[in-house]
């Protein structure tokens, strides 16, 4: 399913309506806000065609993670007794909503032009169904021996319980779609009648399929695979970190653009995955390594499940398994060599002790001299440890700006706790200049996508690229609390990777949730160089116009060697005279406030980098 289609389906839940003109207007508004330019007539026509053609069926799955503020309170493997006491009441409210959330996941259907009737039908079936005897909260709290249900177990029990309603829903859906085919207005043109009938026929057939055991089992199996995939991801720390950054940014985005239907309760996230493709991939490979990695890619990179994404995943997993096998063999070899070295060293020490014993018999030493020497050595060692401890107390502020050490500290040794070191590429520093100078450099540069941009476009791009103050955070000891590193890849003979954090960009009273992207590569001197730095709004990623996922491998930046001779370590960096920005550091946020240079009391915009979600 295309990224446009996913966005349209997302909007159905937000708008609580399905009039096509209203959806187009909402898409237009969000697209223009995200990309900071007006859509052309051709672009609007593409949107219209996409919305008119798409019919959203059997694509939704529930992601078994629950956030409360900046805390992750439920993971796939969380049991009720594992939940922090202060969060249990909130968690139980979320779990109580599972029946309606699961029902929405199973039956959410987007009908181009008018979905009101399907939404009304969905609500009617749910409200007239008795849930007597099924209480997900009681189920979750129940323990058998010392072990209770995991959150994914409760989710799946709820799915299986709700599947019983699908027969009634499917029958009514097919009946009403059939009736609407007979009622198609004669005032429509032949082409419009054809489109309307085709769409309703698809829905009628889908309703009939929902009554079949095969379709019901497919829905259950798809959600079960997602739950298992999320558990697989959760148990791999390197994957968990990236997954949580993406999930947390989606959670924050949903809070800024949607009004909660359940008051102060934040429901679990949903994603759009083709059920049939997911199930068939699992049936083909029977490997959670492959399916778990595939779902991770789909979730992080916004990809569809198709032959290309499946093949890429299979190759990636096999390469990783081979690398892990080679690494394991190398570690075993090193352990064997180390054991042999230790054995030889022990043998040499024993022989040395024997030779010392023989020497003492021939020549006696001065009484107590050995004890004095040992004491002196111990005092010297303690003195060195105190000196090293003092060295480690270099302040974060000094390290962030590359400042000199305090005079009281030794200048002969380097602090072990010094922050991260990064050089900054010319293409990043370019954005600190005026829009006119940036345009001149881009027009003469080798990057085709940046040529011939208007001054207005450059000024808008400058807002999200001129965030060089983020380097202060990147170089600090706190960087790992805000950013995760992605997998590394090779391009043009250089090793590249990204660091990604969650950010909120504010301007003119509007907030945009997104990610702070940092692109890095390893230079010939084995140093880390920042060649890409920007804030990317979630709406920009959803719009998909030339936008790449923050977690996707690869990029379109070439010719890094062009600016390699003009790298900077950003020590003591200052903006040109007259430009003002202020850094505000808090416990869980790093905020950059940009002010009007002519009137510093006026805030133009701000960027807040948020600490990673806390896992309870």
From Swiss-Prot:
Cite the source lineage.
Eukaryota, Fungi, Fungi incertae sedis, Microsporidia, Unikaryonidae
- According to its UniProt entry, this protein's organism is Encephalitozoon cuniculi (strain GB-M1) (Microsporidian parasite)
| UniProt family annotation | Belongs to the UPF0329 family.
Protein name, entry field: UPF0329 protein ECU10_1810
Compositional bias of kind Basic residues? 357-366, 410-422
Q: Where is this region: Disordered?
A: 319-422
Q: Where is the composition biased (Basic and acidic residues)?
A: 319-340, 347-356, 374-383
Biased-composition ranges for Acidic residues?
Answer: 384-396
Name the domain of life.
Eukaryota
User: Pfam families this protein is in?
Assistant: DUF1609 (PF07753), DUF3654 (PF12376)
């Amino acid at each position: 399913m295309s990224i446009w289609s996913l966005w349209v389906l997302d909007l159905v839940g937000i708008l609580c309506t399905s009039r096509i003109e209203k959806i187009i207007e909402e898409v237009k508004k969000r697209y223009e806000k995200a990309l900071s330019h007006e859509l052309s007539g051709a672009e609007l026509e593409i949107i219209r065609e996409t919305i008119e053609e798409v019919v959203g069926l059997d694509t939704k799955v529930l992601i078994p993670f629950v956030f409360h503020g900046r805390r992750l309170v439920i993971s796939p493997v969380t049991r009720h007794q594992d939940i922090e006491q202060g969060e249990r009441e909130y968690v139980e409210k979320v779990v109580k909503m599972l029946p309606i959330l699961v029902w929405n996941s199973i039956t959410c259907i987007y009908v181009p032009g008018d979905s009101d009737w399907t939404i009304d039908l969905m609500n009617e079936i749910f409200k007239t169904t008795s849930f007597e005897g099924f209480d997900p909260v009681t189920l979750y709290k129940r323990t058998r021996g010392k072990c209770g249900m995991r959150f994914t177990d409760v989710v799946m029990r709820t799915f299986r319980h709700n599947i019983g309603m699908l027969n009634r829903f499917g029958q009514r859906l097919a009946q009403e779609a059939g009736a609407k085919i007979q009622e198609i207005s004669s005032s429509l043109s032949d082409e419009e009648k054809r489109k309307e009938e085709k769409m309703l026929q698809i829905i009628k057939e889908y309703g009939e399929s929902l009554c079949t055991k095969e379709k019901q089992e497919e829905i259950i199996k798809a959600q079960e695979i997602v739950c298992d995939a999320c558990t697989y991801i959760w148990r791999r720390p390197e994957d968990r970190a990236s997954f949580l950054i993406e999930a947390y940014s989606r959670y924050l985005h949903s809070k800024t653009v949607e009004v909660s239907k359940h008051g102060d309760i934040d429901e679990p996230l949903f994603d759009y995955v083709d059920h049939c493709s997911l199930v068939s991939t699992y049936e083909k490979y029977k490997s959670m390594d492959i399916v778990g990695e595939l779902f991770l890619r789909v979730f992080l990179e916004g990809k569809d499940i198709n032959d290309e994404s499946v093949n890429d995943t299979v190759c990636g997993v096999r390469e990783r398994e081979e690398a892990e096998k080679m690494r394991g063999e190398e570690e075993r070899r090193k352990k064997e060599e180390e054991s042999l070295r230790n054995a030889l060293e022990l043998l040499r020490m024993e022989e040395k002790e024997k030779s010392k014993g023989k020497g003492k018999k021939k020549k006696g030493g001065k009484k107590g001299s050995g004890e004095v020497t040992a004491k002196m050595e111990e005092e010297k060692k303690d003195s060195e440890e105190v000196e090293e401890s003092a060295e480690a107390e270099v302040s974060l502020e000094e390290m962030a700006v590359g400042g000199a050490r305090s005079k009281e500290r030794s200048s002969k040794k380097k602090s072990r706790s010094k922050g991260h070191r990064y050089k900054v590429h010319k293409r990043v520093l370019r954005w600190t200049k005026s829009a006119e100078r940036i345009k001149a450099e881009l027009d003469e540069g080798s990057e085709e996508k940046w040529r011939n941009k208007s001054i207005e476009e450059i000024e808008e791009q400058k807002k999200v690229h001129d965030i060089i103050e983020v380097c202060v955070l990147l170089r600090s000891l706190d960087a790992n609390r805000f950013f995760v590193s992605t997998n590394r890849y090779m391009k043009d003979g250089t090793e590249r990777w990204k660091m990604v954090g969650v950010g909120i960009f504010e301007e003119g009273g509007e907030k945009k949730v997104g990610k702070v992207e940092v692109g890095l590569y390893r230079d010939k001197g084995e140093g880390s160089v920042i060649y890409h730095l920007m804030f990317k709004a979630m709406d920009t990623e959803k719009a998909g116009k030339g936008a790449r996922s923050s977690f996707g491998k690869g990029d379109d930046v070439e010719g890094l060697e062009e600016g390699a001779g003009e790298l900077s370590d950003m020590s003591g960096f200052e903006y040109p005279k007259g430009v003002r920005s202020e850094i505000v550091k808090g416990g869980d946020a790093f905020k950059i406030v940009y002010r009007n240079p002519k009137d510093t009391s006026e805030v133009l915009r701000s960027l807040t980098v948020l600490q990673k979600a806390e896992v309870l």
